Amino acid sequence: MDATRKPLRIPPAMALYAEEQGVFDIIQKMVKKVLVDRPKDPIQYMIDHLSNDNDDVPRVFILGPPASGKHTMAKLLCKRLNATHLTPESVLSSDVSLLAKEAQSYRDKGQEVPDELWAKLMQQRLSKVDCIKRGWILEGFPKTREQALKLQMAGICPDHLVVLDAPDIVLIERNMGKRIDTANGEVYHTTFDWPSDPTVQRNLVEPEGISEEETGLRLIEYHRNIPGILRTYPKTSKKINADQPYMDVFSQVLTFVLSKPRSLAPHTPRILLYGPPGSGRSLQASLLAQKYGIVNICCGQVLKEAVADQTKLGEVIQPYIENDQQVPDNLVLKILTEHLSSLESATHGWVLHGFPRDTDQAALLKDAGFVPNRVFSLDLSDDVVIERLSLCMTDPVSGERYHDIYKPAPSSEVHERLQQNPRHSEQRVQARLDMYHANAEELDEFYPDVIHINADQDPYTVFEFIESYTVSPLPRPLPEEPTSP
């Protein structure tokens, strides 16, 4: 590239479109489906695949030992995600095909249904419209590694495998209290979920196979088979402790099911940090820039650099800087655009802080084509902000910063010569806080995917939170809960 020419500016629209529409992932999933299903007409198959628009529907296996809560979790997930609930029994009972009749004949003879036949049955059921459009939650299957491998050979692979886990003694106690409603097959428990309706209570019966000895045998079989199943799905499985309140278990299950696997798509971080003064935005931005090589763009710093470099825009904004006045938004945006559209920012990504401070500035940034793909709000109470800033002093001799509580001066001599930045006086800090709070709620509405992080903790703990959300895809949005009629 000719270094004597004007600096290369890359318009962000192309990469932004590809990322927003998930172009890379769409193509990757289509190629995967074509290779697995091997249709006779790949072009028409891909057109149909795009028409289905079902890449993000849930495809989940829920496994676990007896009485671990598989049925409860599957029902809650299906209700929350509007997915189809499947079990081996429901697949057999609702199917009238020749395959189902063949499988039922094995059961009538007291024989095990062959794994290959199970795979064909599942493939047939999952190809129906409700599973394609809404997704599916398969409970209690596969039970062995052989069944899991047969499912893989049939092209059935879950996006998430939930494995519920609890101590055997807890599971045995749970199982012995299980009761079944003969009217509708609903499961209740003598301790944890006893119905209040006397009619339902009269319908409850003790199911077969829940004695301590029988449960122990089923647990032995489960523990023998589950390691092989986990080896079959090493990257999509997660164990969740089921020995806790069921809503806590469900919260963890739902969080996992909504998570997305790490994408192989090219990812250029465009990170926006905002928060009250003293929340640590500058420190977090510098840590991100240092570790990942992205461009650290501090609004206040680039304005001062423009003045110091005596650029044309720098000369225009110099009076505002010298008089401690707010620089007009259009001038700020012009200077930021030079940095945000640079070759380095376009190829390595950027982290921006200090702008925008309100929705008008956020709209200007969006109209200019600079849309962050991660937005973090560093939350801090006013008392902590005032404590952090108003007690911070600087040694004019060494330039070292000290804090009356967290980092006191090493000697009385140093303490006596410490000076406070005028901007850190309690009165001015409170004024900046008032300005921040006046706009914070509207900024949260402007960026609906904003991730709130508690900044009142160790800065490296805060960085770990930011890092985890930056390197991994954002979770799927949670569907709206169905409204009762």
Swiss-Prot record:
Region of interest called Adenylate kinase 1, as start-end residue ranges on this chain: 58-258
InterPro entries xrefs: Adenylat/UMP-CMP_kin, P-loop_NTPase
Keywords: ATP-binding, Cytoplasm, Kinase, Nucleotide-binding, Transferase
Main location: cytoplasm
Region feature (NMP 2): 298-327
UniProt family annotation: Belongs to the adenylate kinase family.
Biological role: Nucleoside monophosphate (NMP) kinase that catalyzes the reversible transfer of the terminal phosphate group between nucleoside triphosphates and monophosphates. Has highest activity toward AMP, and weaker activity toward dAMP, CMP and dCMP. Also displays broad nucleoside diphosphate kinase activity.
Name used for this protein in its record: Adenylate kinase 8
Phylogenetic placement of the source organism: Eukaryota, Metazoa, Chordata, Craniata, Vertebrata
Gene: ak8
